[in-house]
């Protein structure tokens, strides 16, 4: 997002705004993706759910579940990362822990927060079709189902 502002030698305020927009849009998109990996389905996602878990990726839903979990639950997540033993049955257990602690909802809440920050960063720009398109891009990123 910031490249166009740099090329056109925009004001520092505009460069900073577009930097903030791009950063927060990216975070919002990724957080939504992290949540969808545990709540989506193959038909809507175009990929199997649980891929992040099965690949050993430590995403926010897992981090929050780990932090909130008891010793046994923490050990479960540690073993998944350290021992690299992951399968569909263990995924079901991970989802149960994640759901118990409400980490999907909290991850989505963070996505919405970053989406709001991204939109707020655009406040310095006049209302145009281009700004509107960027605002819709934020909306799509946080309400998407795939």
Language-model features and meaning:
Residues 1-146:
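All-alpha prenyltransferase/terpene-synthase fold signal
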């Amino acid at each position: 997002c910031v490249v166009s502002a740099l090329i056109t030698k925009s004001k520092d305020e505009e460069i900073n705004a577009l930097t903030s927009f791009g950063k927060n849009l990216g975070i919002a998109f990724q957080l939504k993706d992290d949540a969808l990996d545990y709540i989506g389905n193959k038909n809507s996602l175009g990929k199997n759910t649980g891929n992040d878990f099965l690949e050993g990726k430590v995403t926010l839903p897992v981090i929050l579940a780990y932090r909130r979990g008891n010793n046994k639950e923490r050990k479960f997540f540690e073993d998944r990362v350290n021992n690299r033993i992951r399968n569909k049955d263990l995924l079901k257990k991970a989802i149960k822990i994640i759901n118990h602690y409400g980490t999907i909802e909290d991850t989505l809440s963070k996505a919405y927060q970053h989406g709001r920050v991204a939109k707020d960063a655009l406040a310095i720009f006049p209302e145009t079709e281009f700004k509107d398109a960027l605002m819709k891009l934020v909306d799509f990123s946080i309400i998407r189902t795939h």
